[in-house]
């Protein structure tokens, strides 16, 4: 059965994401953490392109969806997990191993849940923080420490705790914005230009602030919703 060459095009982006994820693992295993971390960020860019290319070329397929999920496990599950272990996790023996493994497991659960709920969930939000966002938050912490050296002593334990938190957030019911479905307008276009300018000037700091706000947004929104539900229950009681 002949295959339309156009179907290969978006999958090349997905395959490239896996390749960069593997390169990230290799660099991390040789303690070249800066390169390893930026490769995960580069994988995020490719991950955002494959779906768009598939939609633009009208080559969306079930194979592409499953292939993308497998790529995400490698690039955003295994790669940041091993970066975490080689960077600080090994100092804590089996605890470090367990934390690194749990991140991959929770990420795989997150992807499986996403695949079976794609047609029923709100297209403008994700249930649980997306695994690419969690992965980028991990590598940004490593890059920030490489530059500012804040992970020492007890803060290494906090970093492992942060990894566990990200894993829990991935399988939680906390909703996060889906920027792939955002509606473009002039105001948003200007904001994106400002953000890209900041990324050009201070890439690490700008990305860290943006991703930090993204992380906190979901948690604060969830807290407000819980407070509202409790208040309404007490009011109706």
Swiss-Prot record:
Keywords: Cell membrane, Lipid biosynthesis, Lipid metabolism, Membrane, Phospholipid biosynthesis, Phospholipid metabolism, Transferase, Transmembrane, Transmembrane helix. GO terms for cellular component: plasma membrane. This is CDP-diacylglycerol--serine O-phosphatidyltransferase. The gene is pssA. Its EC number is 2.7.8.8. It comes from Helicobacter pylori (strain J99 / ATCC 700824). It comes from the Bacteria. The chain crosses the membrane at residues 3-23, 25-45, 73-93, 95-115, 124-144, 150-170, 184-204, 207-227. Pfam families: CDP-OH_P_transf. One of its GO terms (molecular function) is CDP-diacylglycerol-serine O-phosphatidyltransferase activity. It is found in: Cell membrane. It is an enzyme of class 2 (transferase). Belongs to the CDP-alcohol phosphatidyltransferase class-I family.
């Amino acid at each position: 059965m002949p295959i339309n060459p156009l179907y290969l095009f978006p999958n090349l982006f997905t395959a490239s994401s896996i390749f960069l994820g593997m390169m990230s693992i290799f660099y991390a295993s040789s303690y070249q953490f800066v390169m390893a971390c930026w490769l995960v960020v580069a994988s995020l860019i490719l991950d955002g392109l494959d779906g768009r290319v598939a939609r633009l070329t009208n080559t969306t397929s079930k194979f592409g969806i499953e292939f993308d999920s497998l790529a995400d496990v490698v690039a955003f599950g295994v790669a940041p997990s091993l970066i975490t272990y080689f960077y600080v996790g090994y100092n804590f023996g089996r605890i470090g191993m367990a934390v690194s493994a749990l991140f991959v497991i929770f990420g795989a659960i997150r992807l499986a849940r996403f695949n079976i709920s794609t047609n029923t969930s709100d297209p403008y939000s994700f249930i649980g923080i997306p695994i690419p966002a969690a992965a980028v938050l991990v590598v940004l912490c490593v890059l920030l420490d490489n530059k500012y050296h804040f992970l020492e002593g007890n803060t290494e334990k906090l970093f492992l705790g942060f990894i566990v938190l990200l894993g829990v957030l991935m399988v939680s019911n906390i909703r996060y914005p889906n920027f792939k479905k955002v509606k473009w307008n002039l105001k948003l276009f200007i904001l994106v230009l400002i953000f890209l300018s900041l990324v050009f000037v201070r890439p690490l700091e700008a990305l860290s602030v943006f991703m930090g706000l993204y992380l906190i947004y979901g948690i604060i929104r969830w807290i407000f919703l819980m407070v509202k539900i409790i208040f309404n229950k007490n009011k109706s009681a």
